[in-house]
Amino acid sequence: MRVHDDPCNPNPAPLYLGLMSGTSVDGIDAALVRINANAITHCELIAAQTSAWDPNLRTTLLELSQGQNTASLDQLGWLDAQVGLAFATAANTLIAKTGIKHTQIRAIGSHGQTIRHRPHGDLPFTWQLGDAHRIAELTGITTVADFRRRDVAAGGQGAPLMPAFHLAILGSANENRAVLNLGGIANLTLIPMTGPVLGFDTGPANALLDSWYQRHHHETFDQSGNFAASGKINQKLLACLLADPWFTLPPPKSTGREQFHLDWVTKQLEPTPPSPADVQATLLELTAVTVADALLRQQPKTNRLLICGGGAHNPVLMARLAAHLPNVTVESIQTYGLNPDYLEAMGFAWLAAQTLDGQPGNLPSVTGARGLRLLGAIHPA
């Protein structure tokens, strides 16, 4: 795809590039967007693509995020550089395909790769790998990164960060909306017609579904939810999983693979495990039930639930959500002309714009931070 500026508009809105890899570590999403001068009301996706991880690097990152690998300082330094290199390569590859010049892009917003998220305790922290100095050096583009840590330092969860972006592009004065990102972890943004926006993680989504599927198949994910559809929900297993006290915590709350991983599931499978397909069906139902329960408790008069992330392509999961939410319109954000696969990458491009424009990127009503904060560190080109 070649991108050309409109000759009738000599001062087009600036371009930004967002980079995102989530808890599933299933690829690096790169999104080139044009954001209007206010960085509030309009964010146009110009081009996007997903770059595959090196398989060995992906395995190491998954092990780290699940606490299965204790890396040395040398290994962590090497991984930080490798992730930075992978992100820079993803950015440069997309830019080359568009035909634009690097100098036309005002900034890159890079999420990095989360390897640990500990928002509770005496000294909370969150840690994302991906050397932003290296990204700026290899792309020649100012890079804004490390968005979550300032919110954590201000007493917040550091997550989710997308609600401010969701409000900017999907808020409505006519109906109560919610945005559901079905990535590795499911998270909700609640956007009422009036009142504060809320946002929080609801529990596992693709992280568990993909991991269980990969244990029994060569492919990386359950295409169209077919494997889950071939099984039956095991109510006993579902009840055991739902008994985890994390699900009853009130917002603000966030989680990750360190909380919800395959060992968490397999501990509940003894002494007589259900069939693999039944476990897949039960994990899918777990996602649907926890999302629906959270939505009905926190915003019971929701009119519309807009879905993004990989789960938006899973018709079985979409159907289960609709079944649990009969009075809510459940639909993909594709209905609004937005690509469900790249909304988060677009969001980090938007966050970069917010930071460079001196505007806050967090919502204290979502994260629990003490106030609005500029997010991220700026690494000049």
UniProtKB/Swiss-Prot annotation:
The record's catalysed reaction(s) read:
1,6-anhydro-N-acetyl-beta-muramate + ATP + H2O = N-acetyl-D-muramate 6-phosphate + ADP + H(+)
Instruction: Name the Pfam families for this protein.
Output: AnmK
Instruction: Provide the E.C. number(s) assigned to this enzyme.
Output: 2.7.1.170
Give the residues the record marks as binding ATP.
G22, T23, S24, V25, D26, G27, I28, D29
Tell me the SUPFAM superfamilies matching this sequence: Actin-like ATPase domain
Which BP terms in the Gene Ontology apply to this protein?
1,6-anhydro-N-acetyl-beta-muramic acid catabolic process; amino sugar metabolic process; peptidoglycan turnover
Q: For this protein, what is any one GO molecular function term?
A: phosphotransferase activity, alcohol group as acceptor
Q: Which pathway is recorded for this entry?
A: Amino-sugar metabolism; 1,6-anhydro-N-acetylmuramate degradation; Cell wall biogenesis; peptidoglycan recycling
Q: Which UniProt keywords apply?
A: ATP-binding, Carbohydrate metabolism, Kinase, Nucleotide-binding, Transferase
Q: Which family does it belong to?
A: Belongs to the anhydro-N-acetylmuramic acid kinase family.
What is the role of the protein in this entry?
A: Catalyzes the specific phosphorylation of 1,6-anhydro-N-acetylmuramic acid (anhMurNAc) with the simultaneous cleavage of the 1,6-anhydro ring, generating MurNAc-6-P. Is required for the utilization of anhMurNAc either imported from the medium or derived from its own cell wall murein, and thus plays a role in cell wall recycling.
Q: Which PANTHER family match?
A: ANHYDRO-N-ACETYLMURAMIC ACID KINASE
Q: Which NCBIfam families match?
A: PRK09585.1-3, PRK09585.3-2
Q: What is this protein called?
A: Anhydro-N-acetylmuramic acid kinase
